[in-house]
Amino acid sequence: MAKNSIRVRYAPSPTGHLHIGNARTAIFNYLFARHNKGKFIIRIEDTDTKRNIEDGERSQLENLKWLGLDWDEGPDVGGDYGPYRQSERRDIYTPLIQQLLDEGKAYESYRTEEELQADREAQKARKEMPHYEYEYAGMSEEEKQAAIDEAKAKGLKPVIRFRVPKDEVFAWDDMVKGHVSFNSDTIGGDFVIAKRDGMPTYNFAVVVDDHKMAISHVFRGDDHVANTPKQLMIYQAFGWEAPKFGHMSLIISKDTGKKLSKRDESVLQFIEQYRSLGYLPEAMFNFILLLGWSPVGEEEIFNKKQFIKMYDETRLSSSPATFDSDKLEWLNNRYVKDADDSTIMDLALKQLIKAGNMPANPDAKTIEWARQLINLYKRQMSYMAQINDMASVFFEEPEQVSGEAFDEINNDTAPVVLKEFAAQIEALDLFDSVEIFKVIKSVQAKTGIKGRQLWMPIRIAVTHEMHGPELPESIELVGRETALEHIHQTLAQLKG
């Protein structure tokens, strides 16, 4: 197949926000298209009207754009193969469903939900796999028609079921998993292709859409493997050529070793959550791509252009991918360190404002102070929201020094250092990091105390923390008045 005939799609359902797993599907399809100079299409699969949420589509597209993805066709940009929402394509589906009915490849089914549930319970009691039992089994055409007429007289509306071929093998060479095959007798019987309201089900609509939109390759999650034989049956029924399929491995939790579940609230799983915490989109793109795909060599950090150039679908792994939030934090920290100061300033300032640690409309003096603060913590932050906890000493009145920190300075030399340091910074004409550094050296010279016994009492007294960024810069941002107040409080505590 020529590269320019490659067409792939990401087809989200607006039943929720963009999940890590779905973002991975979008990224893999995007890179495959861009690497091969093909087309990347967005299609909204909104046939599940009961579960669609109000801002589902907007949120999906907005977060894809935030990750750095763009598309050639879609509901917002149009294209030659529209409409790009399934809810707007019923005029395409309806005659095709009727065609299958006319050809005897599908039929009306009036079995109620209660009857189907009773069937499932009986099958369970017999230790059988749940499956649809043909409701017209053993009936003559006259008896079948009588049953249909009776159902209609009761006001029942039918679903449309696809007539599954008996004992036939449906197979494909999966681009990730290798050769996969299913016997038609194992898929659960005749399946629904149109609901009672006439809306097509996923398995029918996706086949029609992929065919009509000339989709050449389908990359999707491993949970769609069981759908593939059903879709191949529909392709066969229409005499259409199926696209090539690639089913990506499951994503499992590092902590549980089990499939990442949307119900597991201990793990952040939605792109919007990471945006809200101030993660960088480039880092998220990089991290998500490594969930089931690996570049050649040891290096794992590249920009999007490099990933497009090197992308090779044969390096997709069939083994489960482990979601490791610690690795994500490490990776994002690498990107934070390399990001330009203005980007980090903008993102971190938003976090400070959101937490109430900065006014919504700070003046120039406050912004300059914030700039110094953010630069001070930039290399330590894994994501921007951490600035509020890391720099809490600048926003909250600290409690008394306690625990390990108090034990560290509860000695004879700490009061000597603190008294001398307080006296010298109080006498400074210019209170900045350069002068503060000079004072620390002067205290060392005057007291003969050096190393940890010198700077640890100063850090703990001023910031109430044992660790942190550069000490002189931290003290400058705390301010002379507050620094002296903290030192005197600590001295009183040590006397106590």
Curated annotation (Swiss-Prot):
EC top class, in one word? Answer: ligase
The record, for InterPro entries, names: aa-tRNA-synth_I_cd-bd, aa-tRNA-synth_I_codon-bd_sub2, aa-tRNA-synth_I_CS, aa_tRNA-synth_I_cd-bd_sf, Glu-tRNA-ligase_bac/mito, Glu/Gln-tRNA-synth, Glu/Gln-tRNA-synth_Ib_cat-dom, GluQ/Sye
What's a GO biological-process term for it?
Answer: glutamyl-tRNA aminoacylation
Keywords recorded for this protein, A-Z: Aminoacyl-tRNA synthetase, ATP-binding, Cytoplasm, Ligase, Nucleotide-binding, Protein biosynthesis
Q: GO CC annotations?
A: cytosol
Q: Name one Pfam family in it.
A: Anticodon_2
> Where in this protein would one find the motif 'KMSKS' region, according to its record?
259-263
Please indicate the residue ranges that the annotation assigns to the motif 'HIGH' region: 12-22
Q: Does the keyword Ligase apply?
A: yes
Query: Is Magnesium a UniProt keyword of this protein?
Result: no
Cellular compartments annotated: Cytoplasm
Residues reported to bind ATP: 262
Q: According to its UniProt record, which reaction does this protein catalyse?
A: tRNA(Glu) + L-glutamate + ATP = L-glutamyl-tRNA(Glu) + AMP + diphosphate
Q: How is the subunit organization of this protein annotated in UniProt?
A: Monomer.
Report the protein's function: Catalyzes the attachment of glutamate to tRNA(Glu) in a two-step reaction: glutamate is first activated by ATP to form Glu-AMP and then transferred to the acceptor end of tRNA(Glu).
HAMAP family, sorted? Glu_tRNA_synth_type1
What family does the database annotate? Belongs to the class-I aminoacyl-tRNA synthetase family. Glutamate--tRNA ligase type 1 subfamily.
State the name under which the record lists this protein: Glutamate--tRNA ligase 2
What is the scientific name of the source organism? Levilactobacillus brevis (strain ATCC 367 / BCRC 12310 / CIP 105137 / JCM 1170 / LMG 11437 / NCIMB 947 / NCTC 947) (Lactobacillus brevis)
Could you read off the lineage of the organism from its UniProt record? Bacteria, Bacillati, Bacillota, Bacilli, Lactobacillales
